[in-house]
Amino acid sequence: MAKKKTNEQPSVKEVPKPAEGEVICVVKKMLGAEHVQVICLDGKERLGRIPGKMKKKMWVKEGDVVLAAPWDFQPNKCDIIYKYSESEVRRLEEEQVVSADIIEQLRG
């Protein structure tokens, strides 16, 4: 029996962009216990928390670009929502959501 031919197009996944109340950050330091220190594009340094539903699926390391949601009641803390891959960071740069120079400065 012959194999069925499929004409599947490679699906292009939509890159999440920061909504209202969200900011793009770069991981500066791993602190342990699912906490990281991040530098955000708004110029603030925050303590980020990786939620339990993401900590096993998403491995975060220093220098990664992440999407974070600052807390309303403690603006110096945030939750990590999404980790961008290198190709997604390039796509954000192409769409002019963030510039490559700023990302490189934050990565140090």
UniProtKB/Swiss-Prot annotation:
Disulfide bonds: none annotated. It comes from the Archaea. PROSITE patterns: IF1A (PS01262), S1_IF1_TYPE (PS50832). Keywords: Initiation factor, Protein biosynthesis. One of its GO terms (molecular function) is RNA binding. Pfam families: eIF-1a. Residues 11-85 form the S1-like domain. The keyword Protein biosynthesis applies. CDD domains: S1_IF1A. NCBIfam families: eIF-1A, PRK04012.1-1, PRK04012.1-3, PRK04012.1-5. Belongs to the eIF-1A family. Seems to be required for maximal rate of protein biosynthesis. Enhances ribosome dissociation into subunits and stabilizes the binding of the initiator Met-tRNA(I) to 40 S ribosomal subunits. HAMAP family: aIF_1A. This is Translation initiation factor 1A.
